[in-house]
Regions:
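STAS-like cytosolic regulatory interaction modules
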Residues: 1-39, 51-91
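Short, glycine-rich nucleotide/cofactor-binding loops
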Residues: 42
Length: 91
């Protein structure tokens, strides 16, 4: 499991990528990402998530994204990523 906070953009997306790669190397089950403190994500950050999902799918896993703020959830909806990732409502 991983929690995202603040902003994920071109400047800090590599840090997110390395965290996710660490989880992916374990090749165990699904990855859950809590976004309750995430305030912003750009296309670079979305690209990192998509790349991670491709790796997870290689071993029949999935990525669940939880607690997206409404305006970030809208980005996932507009880009169609809400159909690719498992999105859980805030709660």
């Amino acid at each position: 499991n991983i929690s995202l906070s603040g902003e994920i953009d071109i400047y800090n997306a590599p840090e997110l990528k390395s965290k996710l790669l660490g989880l992916l190397e374990q090749k165990k089950g699904d990855i859950r990402i809590d976004c309750k403190d995430l305030k912003y994500i750009d296309s670079t950050g979305l690209g990192v998530l998509i790349s991670a999902l491709r790796h997870v799918k290689d071993y029949d896993g999935n990525i669940t994204i939880r607690n997206l703020k409404p305006y970030i959830q809208k980005i996932f909806r507009i880009t169609g990523l809400d159909k690719v990732f498992i999105i859980e409502a805030q709660g």
